[in-house]
């Protein structure tokens, strides 16, 4: 039933949507919101703001009511609890509301004539253990699935609500191929089953021992049947015994899988992570892939008396850095870190400022640069209330209040908070001016001073006011100019409480107070 459901849904997708699709921008914004990573932001403040922006783009609180936003959230959760095939089919049709989702699922059930409980749990377990493909069924085994009841009457299973292999009937007649085709035909080609079984080997000893073994019953009663909901009883002695007696189960394709080890690994995974059933299905499929031998290998071609020992899953150690740069040999823990590092060698700067066109290697660098245009200063000094664009600038400024000066000039004894400040100061003693202008030959001790000087030749004014359009060569000039529009006057006189936009204006004003004292 599960195979028929998956194939029918795929056939419906291939034929195209019969419903009118709506704008997919909402789904795009939802995926961006769910897939956003903390490492994409420069810090917690930026990460929170980015998540807020993505959430508003998805839910659109200014356009939607509270009830509509709540419906979107419930709709998203409802899609995640659907079976994987139905969820994929519904998302392809991009439903815009709950009525649309319910009608899509009801139409699909009526089209495929599927009951509301969808799929038998036994079939779902077999579907996860054996992907759709050319199946080879051992001659002495049959299933209690309705799609395969043409093979003969099924014997009553010794364990309730669990499927185990059963010995086949004495005689099987597969001459009525037409009846079988009518029963299984869903309107698209199905893989052809190999029905030419030899009845001489139906009493092979391993089959009888397998169906009578307590280990097989315990495996099928355990939490590996996650949708049946039978609790697994932890018994160390039985687990050890299971590893010594026929540690396998046989799928529809004839592949032997390690039952006890598969059960043990899956229970550990389930106890570690509390995930929804659809996520457990995907994790179970991964465990099966790790233990699955070569596809198409039948029990007759494999040695079933020897335990199947798959290669253990290799876990990364905490300090392991497997990704190495071929240019410089530097190693990284993540491939994304290596990709970002390789841009240094290639000179690639993918992040461009829309205001001035300057490019950057990292998105965090671009975000900090854009503060120059917006005037944003998120870091504030708690002592003097002065604000800064970078946290490092705030830390350096706070040293002026604590009188922490760790860098001292040996020539004049002057101390500085930063090593870079001491380095610039030393050039005043040596007279070093390494930065020279190619236009007029003038030299400067600092690169920033040369950059500002060159703008007098090029007449470049990169700092533009967003209010009036006036441009400036230096950013401090733009900051002072913006105070005209904002009305900010940060410099306050301590005598008369009068405020000024520039420090020079405050100094000139304070002279009037001192004149009276003289």
UniProtKB/Swiss-Prot annotation:
Task: Note the PROSITE patterns from the entry.
Answer: SCAN_BOX (PS50804), ZINC_FINGER_C2H2_1 (PS00028), ZINC_FINGER_C2H2_2 (PS50157)
Q: Where in the cell is it found?
A: Nucleus
Q: What is its main location?
A: nucleus
Stretches for region Disordered: 292-325
Gene Ontology MF terms: DNA-binding transcription factor activity, RNA polymerase II-specific; RNA polymerase II cis-regulatory region sequence-specific DNA binding; zinc ion binding
Entry keyword annotation includes tRNA processing: no
Gene Ontology CC: nucleus
Where in this chain does the record put each SCAN box domain? 30-112
Q: Where is the composition biased (Polar residues)?
A: 292-304
Q: Which InterPro entries match?
A: SCAN_dom (IPR003309), SCAN_sf (IPR038269), Znf_C2H2_sf (IPR036236), Znf_C2H2_type (IPR013087)
Please state the residue ranges covered by C2H2-type zinc fingers: 323-345, 351-373, 379-401, 407-429, 435-457, 463-485, 491-513
Q: Which UniProt keywords apply?
A: DNA-binding, Metal-binding, Nucleus, Repeat, Transcription, Transcription regulation, Zinc, Zinc-finger
Taxonomic superkingdom: Eukaryota
CDD domains referenced in this protein's UniProt entry, alphabetically = FYVE_like_SF, SCAN
GO BP, one example?
Answer: spermatogonial cell division
| Similarity comment | Belongs to the krueppel C2H2-type zinc-finger protein family.
Q: What does this protein do?
A: May be involved in transcriptional regulation.
Q: What is this protein called?
A: Zinc finger protein 449
UniProt source species: Pan paniscus (Pygmy chimpanzee)
